[in-house]
């Protein structure tokens, strides 16, 4: 993205809107014009990037993570605007007074989409994978403080303890956004091959939806997760088609093959904004980069204002 913030318009076909549905507040999503969730139907949309794996860590650093895979995987918790925690897979987290020890407790009613229970074994397996130098997905750095990976020790099937060298708000944020992999789906797979093995085309997930069919680089069809622990989604499922060309996406949208079409230029917007057949929704898309400064580090140069 060349700009930090821009307005993107989502165009919804009025005909497709009749079958369009969204998740409720607990599962995320949108409401109809009257503010009521729309029940049933399948949401169909296109993305430019090809989907080559169902493994979260093969997709977390791209827009696929936000657009697709956050519907398939749940984190430990999400942060509310007031700083409070909206727990998901985690039931609670207790932090020591010095901020170096985190005791995380999982819910005891969470299951993978294939019916297997989610336990701290899955957390240990995921972190063991992230610590492998040959794997080293970009998200692994989030679990390091001063270059050292956190330590972790399973206490029970629902309790695990993390330790870091010093207090770090960024580590707390990273722990909340930890997405775990199903250890039982990778039995016998070397740690160096967890992200590349064939099992990634058909693995269990923890979110509101589960993959029903998957064609690498072409299409992903998802249905409600029958074992989901929170309020079920209002829609029956969604379908993601990999279409790299924006013009081809627009043609499919006009042919009623897609529920939604994303545009980012005024010329294309003019074709839809005054057409009663379509509903145009605009939203700001901001990208924020975080920087952590340690003023106690030595040697530390004299502080002076810095223009970013």
Identify the residue ranges that each predicted region occupies:
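N-terminal lobe/hinge region of extracytoplasmic solute-binding protein
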Residues: 46-97, 128, 204-205
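Alpha-helical secondary-structure segments
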Residues: 44, 119-125, 157-161, 207-208, ...
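Ligand-binding "clamshell"
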Residues: 270-282
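Ligand-site clamp/hinge motif
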Residues: 226-271
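Aromatic- and charge-enriched surface segment that lines or borders ligand/interaction sites
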Residues: 91-136, 155, 252, 301-302
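Gly/Pro-rich hinge or "lid" segments in bacterial periplasmic/extracellular proteins
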Residues: 81, 176-233, 237
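Surface-exposed binding/hinge segments that line
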Residues: 94, 141-188
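Short, low-complexity disordered leader/linker segments with a strong preference
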Residues: 1-42, 84, 97, 151
